[in-house]
Regions:
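Intrinsic disorder/low-complexity signal
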Residues: 6-7, 219
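Internal amphipathic alpha-helices that form coiled-coils
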Residues: 1-4
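Charged, low-complexity assembly regions of eukaryotic complex subunits
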Residues: 16-219
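Carbohydrate-associated surface elements
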Residues: 11
Length: 219
């Protein structure tokens, strides 16, 4: 094998050891709709077309099932021998271009693990938000964007609680009043203080916040 082929082989073997991440050969760039049939444990790097496929599987701890897989095809640039993203199914909210620029040709393992981590954190965020809804009475998740970065819960007392979340934390919380339910400024600030921070203890945060979110006026 040439030096480059040995490097490629080592790179692929390293990737396949990462949990939830699989490197595989890509013989057809239109693989995405048939990717499950293209995975192989041998000849993972397609030297002829300079293509490397990466599959990322995230696991839902609540349902005990893997989610629909995500895929990235990397292609090597003949001019500078560097990889670039040729095809992918990664959602926009993962900010793949940012990660590509920062890590791809400096540390491939780091690039892939960062993508996987972000996908896993969004799934974890979804699970925690759903757990709030199923664990606590009188609260319902009524609105959420695809990345669960902005979510709104309806309380049975007429108030709403809107959360802004990043990959690991509740960045902000806002109490939304209605004509029939009001809350003092001091209580709103206290709720905000309770809710901000890591979302890994979101159920506990909500339990504390609900004690505060008893309307000063309701009909």
């Amino acid at each position: 094998k040439t030096e480059q082929e040995l490097i490629d082989s080592t790179m692929v073997e390293s990737l396949t050891r990462l949990f939830g991440i699989t490197a595989f050969a890509v013989s057809d760039p239109s693989f995405i709709s048939h990717a499950q049939n293209n995975a192989s444990s041998e000849g993972l790097y397609n030297d002829e077309h300079h293509l490397l496929g990466i599959r990322l599987d995230t696991y839902n701890e609540t349902t005990k099932q893997f989610q629909a897989p995500y895929y990235i095809i990397l292609k090597r640039n003949d001019k500078n021998d560097e990889f670039f993203i040729f095809k992918h199914t990664i959602p926009k909210y993962i900010h793949l271009t940012e990660l590509e620029s920062r890590y791809l040709n400096l540390d491939l393992n780091k690039f892939v693990s960062e993508v996987y981590t972000r996908l896993s954190l969004v799934l974890r965020k979804k699970i925690m938000l759903e757990k709030v809804e199923t664990s606590l009475k009188g609260i319902e998740l009524i609105d959420a964007d695809l990345s669960f970065s902005k979510v709104t819960f309806q309380l049975s007392n007429g108030l709403k609680l809107q959360l802004l979340l990043d990959f690991t934390e509740v960045a902000n919380a806002c109490v939304l009043e209605s004509a029939n339910a009001r809350l003092s400024t001091d209580k709103k600030l206290l709720v905000q203080s309770i809710m901000k921070g890591s979302y890994f203890t979101l159920v506990d945060k909500f339990q504390s916040a609900l004690e505060v979110m008893k309307p000063d006026y309701s009909m």
